[in-house]
């Protein structure tokens, strides 16, 4: 069976990734593709438990390196238990966040260092990078305003970080675009939701030749 395609969606808080993924998944299914939808951290029981530890609002004393290692551990288990089997079975895997989140959040915004976080995560993923990454670019103040207006959203520890932290996340993603131009495509998430989805769908169709 033909191997599948691994598509990840990245962006700062409030970029609208999760809502856009609903529309992207529907489009892919309408085109006759088998889709496995997942997220990081999470997607499987072990990783979901790690997620609850990482994002717990009461865990304010968590060391940045502890945080980075927990993300990498969740990523490894999620990759081998869910992502790789789905790809081998020929599915399109749509994942909300992957290695680039660690590079931007822990490597850049937390100040651990891009190269150190890259080393930790390359150990975890063993070279299995996404085939395509959609980076939803949104101004940090716009993104934070969105999440604070969303009454249905469960606030997590990252939501409580200062604006300066989220500005550093944005800078981290800018470096990622420069480092991996062959797989990372930028989407302007400051636009209307419909336009964001249209741009994302167009990019995916080009990559999958739909």
Curated annotation (Swiss-Prot):
CDD domains noted in UniProt: TMPK (cd01672)
Catalytic reaction list: dTMP + ATP = dTDP + ADP
UniProt GO BP: dTDP biosynthetic process; dTTP biosynthetic process; dUDP biosynthetic process
Highest taxon listed in the record's lineage: Bacteria
Cleavable signal peptide: none
Keyword Kinase among record annotations: yes
Residues forming coiled coils: none
Pfam families assigned to the protein according to its UniProt record, in alphabetical order: Thymidylate_kin (PF02223)
EC number: 2.7.4.9
Membership in a protein family: Belongs to the thymidylate kinase family.
Protein name, UniProt field: Thymidylate kinase
Origin species: Halalkalibacterium halodurans (strain ATCC BAA-125 / DSM 18197 / FERM 7344 / JCM 9153 / C-125) (Bacillus halodurans)
Gene: tmk
